[in-house]
């Protein structure tokens, strides 16, 4: 599940919590759906364009992405921001569920900090 596409009725009726992560989780879209994870996408900057890093490759195909990399184009990422985490958290909390958030390393990205700020703001 991608942030923003979750409605309260889809929020895991048999669990008291939802596991949230970001798109650096190194899971396939199929795995994330099977595990019922809420996934917040980071942004990939490549060849002058910004793309959400969606696990299903729908924003930029894996073939296009790796083709550009092989062609020498530099790719960088931008952390998920507080608003993206709040958007993902809102329907989960509205359904009365707790959130366990497992994010990209705070030593490498501000994604973890964004998740923490969003959680504090949503209390």
What is the meaning of each model-derived region?
Residues 18-79, 84:
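N-terminal glycine-rich anion-binding loop in soluble enzyme alpha/beta folds
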Residues 23, 103-104:
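Small/polar loops that bind or transfer phosphate-bearing groups
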Residues 1-13:
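Short, Lys/Arg-enriched N-terminal segments with co-localized hydrophobic residues
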Residues 33, 93, 120:
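Anion (oxyanion) recognition and catalysis
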Residues 104-122:
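Short Gly/Thr/Asp-enriched flexible loops that form oxyanion-binding sites at enzyme active sites
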Residues 79-86, 104-110:
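N-terminal glycine-rich "phosphate-gripper" loop used for MgATP/nucleotide binding
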Residues 91-99:
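Glycine-rich phosphate-binding loop signature in dinucleotide/nucleotide-binding domains
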Residues 81-92, 115-118:
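Short, charged beta->alpha transition segments
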